[in-house]
Every structure is written in structure tokens, then in C-alpha cells.
Amino acid sequence: NVAQAYAYEMYVGGFWCHQNPNNGESVNERLSKVGFPFTTVGENLAIASTVRSGHQSLMQSDSHRNTILDNEFRRVGIGVVSGPIGLIIVQVFS
């Protein structure tokens, strides 16, 4: 799962951003690398104490909510990793 792998990568690498600062990969490149077909892609990231609070936080942000509700997306992958600062949550939409 691309979302789970990226959540873990951020946890181990000690970063939290859409583009991996160590290798420059974007969500598009991560999907392409595993051969996942897509035309449109979106990614949401959150750090929260629970999955519910992370989702609520994303839904309160206009841009993140728009990604979640975008009817062009037909698939979603979700990754969650628990660390010392809480849960790292990654949502990948295509």
C-alpha cells in the first residue's frame, strides 16, 4: 500500500511533507514506481492523536475536504503509523 509505505517512510525519516525531502519523490512518482495506473491523484497528510480526530481535522480544511469529496477520485488508500508524536495519517486518492 503506497499510503502505508509513505506514512512509515515519513516516520522513519523524521519528516512530514508531500514531497520526500530525501529523494524528491511526489505521490505521483510513488504510484508510478509501483505500477499503479492513475490519471488524477490527490494526497492528504495529517498528524493526530486518533484516526477520527485526524479525519475531522482534514474535513475542517477546505482544500483537504475538497480532495476527500472530489467525485473524480474512485480509489483511496489509507496508511497510518503510530509514533511518539501521534498518528501519521496518509490518504492517497486516484
Segments from the language model and where they lie:
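Functional surface patches built around histidine and acidic residues
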Residues: 1-94
